[in-house]
Each structure stands twice: as C-alpha cells, then as structure tokens.
C-alpha cells in the first residue's frame, strides 16, 4: 500500500514525504517533479504555456501512474485532489494523509521557497489567494484523506512521528 500526502502548497508534503520515505525504506515519488520531468519544463512554465487545465491533465496522468505503484511514499501537487479520478485512485491504492496548516503558515513557507515557483500565488495578494484556495479545496482534501494532520508550528520529525503512529494503528509496518 502506498502512503499518499495531500495538502496545500507549503503544508510539508515534499519535506515530510522525503523524511518518511527514508524512515520507512520506501521510494519517494513527488508528482510535481514527475510532471516536470515528463514535460521537460517547470510547473510554472507549464502553467504559463498551457494554463491550469493543461497542467491538471498532465498531473492526472502522473497521479494514475504513481497510484499504480506500490509501497511508495507519494507527495501530490496541492491541486491533485480537485479531480475525482485522482482522489479515487489515491484512496484505492494508498493511505491518504492530509497535511493541513493555517493559510498564514502556508504563506510563510511558500514565501521562503520563492513565490515565483508558485503560479497560483502570482498577483497582488498571495495570502488572500492562499486563503481562498484553502477554503475552496478543504472539502476535496477531506474527501480524499483517511486522516488529517496539522503541521502548524511542528517539526518535520514530529509530523513524521505522528504519521508513523497512524500507520501502526492501521497495522502497517512500513
């Protein structure tokens, strides 16, 4: 069974996913990086050339491929849950964990990584945009996830430890 991390940009999917995969001795898959590798362009460049819909089409293909694998830790793009087929494939083949945080925390993290890498936050009010994205996507994350973990003011190690506890509760051994 895969372990799948969903959540908004800045929630910790990639950083937590890498550490979790290392602890479990499993491969780590980042769907945004797979989309970039397939396209030969960055996510920002794909958004600029093809728009969000073009990116989401590419993302759906990658999510289907990733979900078809087994025993991986998968970090999805923040909007992967918007498509029904993605939510269904991820839930069917994995234990889906929603990494959640307050919009202010997400904004601080995204800003630290460079807002230019986040096409959905371009514009005059990135924090306001992030608040709107959080409100709009919350129902999709809730529908996709088996469990929700808050990452506000927590270390990567602490979040990974909580995930390990959740896996043990489910009888998963990693």
From Swiss-Prot:
| Cellular localisation | Cytoplasm
The pathway entry for this protein reads as: Metabolic intermediate biosynthesis; chorismate biosynthesis; chorismate from D-erythrose 4-phosphate and phosphoenolpyruvate: step 5/7
Catalytic activity, EC: 2.7.1.71
One GO location term (cellular component): cytosol
Q: Which reaction does it catalyse?
A: shikimate + ATP = 3-phosphoshikimate + ADP + H(+)
Give the cofactor note text: Binds 1 Mg(2+) ion per subunit.
Alphabetically, which GO biological process terms does the record hold?
amino acid biosynthetic process; aromatic amino acid family biosynthetic process; chorismate biosynthetic process
* Family that this chain belongs to: Belongs to the shikimate kinase family.
What is the annotated quaternary arrangement, including any partners? Monomer.
By what name is this protein known? Shikimate kinase
List the source organism.
Answer: Symbiobacterium thermophilum (strain DSM 24528 / JCM 14929 / IAM 14863 / T)
Gene for this chain: aroK
């Amino acid at each position: 069974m895969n372990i799948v991390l969903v959540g908004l940009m800045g929630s910790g999917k990639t950083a937590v996913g890498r550490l979790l995969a290392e602890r479990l001795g499993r491969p780590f898959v980042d769907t945004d990086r797979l989309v970039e590798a397939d396209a030969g362009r960055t996510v920002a460049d794909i958004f600029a050339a093809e728009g969000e819909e073009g990116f989401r089409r590419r993302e759906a293909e990658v999510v289907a491929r990733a979900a078809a694998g087994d025993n991986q830790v998968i970090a999805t793009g923040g909007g992967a849950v918007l498509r029904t087929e993605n939510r269904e494939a991820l839930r069917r083949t994995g234990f889906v964990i929603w990494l959640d945080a307050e919009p202010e925390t997400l904004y601080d993290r995204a800003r630290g990584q460079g807002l230019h890498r986040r096409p959905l936050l371009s514009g005059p009010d990135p924090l306001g945009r992030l608040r709107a994205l959080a409100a709009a996507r919350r129902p999709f994350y809730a529908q996709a996830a088996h469990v929700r973990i808050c990452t506000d003011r927590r270390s990567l190690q602490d979040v990974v430890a909580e995930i390990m506890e959740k896996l043990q509760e489910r009888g998963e051994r990693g």
